[in-house]
Amino acid sequence: MADSSKKLTVLLSGASGLTGSLAFKKLKERSDKFEVRGLVRSEASKQKLGGGDEIFIGDISDPKTLEPAMEGIDALIILTSAIPRMKPTEEFTAEMISGGRSEDVIDASFSGPMPEFYYDEGQYPEQVDWIGQKNQIDTAKKMGVKHIVLVGSMGGCDPDHFLNHMGNGNILIWKRKAEQYLADSGVPYTIIRAGGLDNKAGGVRELLVAKDDVLLPTENGFIARADVAEACVQALEIEEVKNKAFDLGSKPEGVGEATKDFKALFSQVTTPF
């Protein structure tokens, strides 16, 4: 367990994202345990989180801009990710998709013909999920950070996974490359490979850990963003999950018992990668 007499100073990158904002809120609510900072890439995103001094603006493609945010931190949670955007169609109008962000319309419960996707200039998976994450890992190591929690994705065992075909971005391939880089970095780490994300309430499902995408073909291959956020926060304090990597899914709501004991959950994880 972390030293309970000292607050952990934690930087969360991607703090204004759908999952990142949930994790940021959870950390802020536990001010007895954590001093939290957020890293975002624009003033608009900073204002979205309240605009306080604890919100830093940085560019993950430029390591020098990351150093002020990482000065003096104990831990880093990486929740940055390239975002595939949806091309408008008759079924999904531009108004519906709010500028084309796929996550606002399509989540793990979506079924139907998959529309076309693209990535914004400079925001391709290679740039964000590989180079951007590598820059964060390198800077954190340089600054003496003691623990990095990286949120990845299930599906990395299958090069032909449909997510890789979105915008021809090979997103899972680049994510897995960053995961391996972190595991080899020498910095204590926790890699959480989340299943299909949905926006339902957290704290109501039984969470499951596994490896090698075994949960993906089943109804247990999905998870609420709020539960991923909670797992990130819990991983900061549970020693047993350091230098471990695992898939994270959940049973359907109403099946099993809601997970409350994260130490018991994480004790099931045995794989370093």
Swiss-Prot record:
Keywords: Detoxification, NAD, NADP, Oxidoreductase
Residues at the active site: 153 (proton donor)
Catalyzed chemical reaction(s): dihydrosanguinarine + NADP(+) = sanguinarine + NADPH; dihydrosanguinarine + NAD(+) = sanguinarine + NADH; dihydrochelirubine + NAD(+) = chelirubine + NADH; dihydrochelirubine + NADP(+) = chelirubine + NADPH
Inhibition and activation profile: Inhibited by iodoacetamide and irreversibly by its product, dihydrosanguinarine.
List of residues binding substrate: 157-161, 175
GO biological processes: response to toxic substance
GO cellular component, one term: chloroplast
Example of a GO MF term: oxidoreductase activity
InterPro entries to which the protein is assigned, alphabetical: NAD(P)-bd_dom (IPR016040), NAD(P)-bd_dom_sf (IPR036291), SARED1-like (IPR044163)
Entry's pH dependence statement: Optimum pH is 6.5-7.5.
Its EC number(s): 1.3.1.107
Gene3D superfamilies attached to this UniProt entry: NAD(P)-binding Rossmann-like Domain
Effect of residue 161 to A: Strongly decreased catalytic activity
Function per UniProt: Catalyzes the reduction of benzophenanthridines, preferentially sanguinarine, to the corresponding dihydroalkaloids. Involved in detoxifying the phytoalexins produced by plant itself. The sanguinarine produced by intact cells upon elicitation, after excretion and binding to cell wall elements, is rapidly reabsorbed and reduced to the less toxic dihydrosanguinarine. Can work with both NAD(P) or NAD as a hydrogen donor, but at low concentrations, the reaction velocity with NAD(P)H is threefold higher than with NADH. However, chelerythrine shows maximum conversion rates with NADH.
Family from the record: Belongs to the NAD(P)-dependent epimerase/dehydratase family.
Oligomeric form and interacting partners: Monomer.
Protein name in UniProt: Sanguinarine reductase
